[in-house]
Amino acid sequence: MADHGASNPGSLDKHGTNEGALWGGRFSGGPSEAMFALSVSTHFDWVLAPYDVLASKAHAKVLNKAGLLSDADLETMLGGLDQLGRDVADGSFVPASSDEDVHGAMERGLIDRVGPEVGGRLRAGRSRNDQVAAMFRMWIRDAIRDIAVQVTQLIDALSEQAKAHPDAIMPGKTHSQAAQPILLAHSLLAHAQPLLRDIQRLQDLDKRLAVSPYGSGALAGSSLKLDPEAIAEELGFDSAADNSLDGTSSRDFASETAFVLAQIAVDMSRLAEEIIYWCTPEYGYVTLSDSWSTGSSIMPQKKNPDVPELVRGKTGRLIGNLSGLMATLKGLPLAYNRDLQEDKEPIVDSVAQLNLLLPAMTGLVSTLTFHENRMRELAPAGFTLATDLAEWMVRQGVPFREAHEASGSCVRIAESRGVDLIDLTDEELASVDSRLTPEVREVLTIDGAVASRSTRGGTAGVRVAEQRERVEKLSGELRGWAETPVRG
């Protein structure tokens, strides 16, 4: 991204001219300084500069194929674009203060390298409307693959922690209240599952991103007999847009991108919320690595969970980006409107935030130290084995309604005495229901409770091991997709 100062309207030395713009013939002068300040977009759309080079090379080839650019001019233009691409990559070419947007800057850069006679021919048959829609799709397709790879790394960190603690039992909660004992690995893999679905959402989104609007012109297509399919193929798209109006004016691909990126953040935020509680003294489930926590400026004892807190806080930012983009799109008539300039900043920002959050969250998770004894100690607290007592009665032929009532009565007695269910006497059990025999104590252990939940997806160790294998297999497959370049 270029230095924002380079495009500061306050530094304009060409006030009142149209230098750096791709329009102006019917205007007697350029925009006012305030108008330019409102219009300029190089401070955020410069990320599209490498894609402008790729798209321009493809466009030059179809101009040549259509007889609108000679072979010699094509060779000159491609050489100039290659040099421009290198100069963008090494930072030697950046937007000038007079450049309105990335497109104007890149055309200026090309003309500087090949002259106006050749460079001025490139714009034939294309509009900024179809150009930016195509380039934005290209940028997003690469960006979501980078994000997907990082999501798999977080998934792998969760899976590795699950593998390292296969037998650790912890309290399972509903409504933030003690519910049933579960395996820690079961809980960690439960956070991996939505992240896998997030990558699948990116994969599915990519099918809609892979439609090229190039060739749609401003809105109605082109009369120059260009070949949109050829450009689409060269740029890695699956097809060209079926409707030029839709191709230039639709941004549902952007709002869908914003949603999936926000959903990734939301899924990380749920994990972050749990870690924040897990590392408190009251829970004591985990200790954070010094590398992924901070201290207090006044309280020497503090070890603060800044990473999960920032994940939680920045998630609101990604949700805001989605909401803002949807509000921008809601009332736009066909076809292109300048409002659509507002599509890029929220997406670029959401990608940037995830590029910060994902590696930090992965580092945090991979270095968590779990305290298995503490989790095991708390697992039966709150009478989490009450369901096991009821289900034992069901296996003895008691209707669940009666078993549920009996188990609740046992909880009431144990609570009044300040003991666990397993500590109730034979007489106390029988006083609740004569069918509660001493054999019920066989299921009133957290190990037995966990092992008994052996249906697919359950918390029994054998089932959790299967879940981990499936998570790792799917994560590897999705990473394979994400690491495959869009363009060969």
Swiss-Prot record:
Molecular function terms from GO: argininosuccinate lyase activity
SUPFAM superfamilies cross-referenced by the UniProt entry: L-aspartase-like (SSF48557)
Highest rank taxon of the organism: Bacteria
Catalyzed reactions: 2-(N(omega)-L-arginino)succinate = fumarate + L-arginine
Pathway the protein contributes to: Amino-acid biosynthesis; L-arginine biosynthesis; L-arginine from L-ornithine and carbamoyl phosphate: step 3/3
Keyword Lyase belongs to the record: yes
Family annotation (InterPro entries): Arg_succ_lyase_C, Argininosuccinate_lyase, Fumarase/histidase_N, Fumarate_lyase_CS, Fumarate_lyase_fam, Fumarate_lyase_N, L-Aspartase-like
Protein family membership: Belongs to the lyase 1 family. Argininosuccinate lyase subfamily.
UniProt-listed HAMAP family: Arg_succ_lyase
Name by which UniProt lists this protein: Argininosuccinate lyase
Organism: Corynebacterium jeikeium (strain K411)
